[in-house]
Amino acid sequence: SYRQYKNEDGSIGKNQMKHHYGYFTNTTGNGKDGDAVDVFIGPNVENCEYVYVVDQNNEQGEFDESKVMLGFNSTEHAKKAYMANYSADWTGFRAITKVPLNVFKKWLYRKHKQRKPFSDYTTIKKKRITE
């Protein structure tokens, strides 16, 4: 399938998606862009204990939004999957954070809009997992 998007200059682009892609229900307005929180679905979604959250930059190199990688086996697997959904010259990758699923759920359903990269939240910094 293809995902269509609008560039900052107003032009329309599209990507061929390599993984299932969507958003979490009941999170509209919580994403940095004011939309729902986006998610890529990996092959092990039924058994995942951890979530990998990618902080993405815009064309100016500033934080744009976070993308959730759910159902991936490792940080490396999640990053590779994320990058596979963008062109070879994509420079939007900023950081990736591995956190336990229960910590992520608390962050996901908070009552405020995301204003900074996922990796910058103090509660996340204390709970992150390093590989």
Q: Where are the model-predicted features located?
A:
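Hydrophobic N-terminal alpha-helices or hydrophobic patches in metabolic proteins across all domains
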Residues: S1-E131
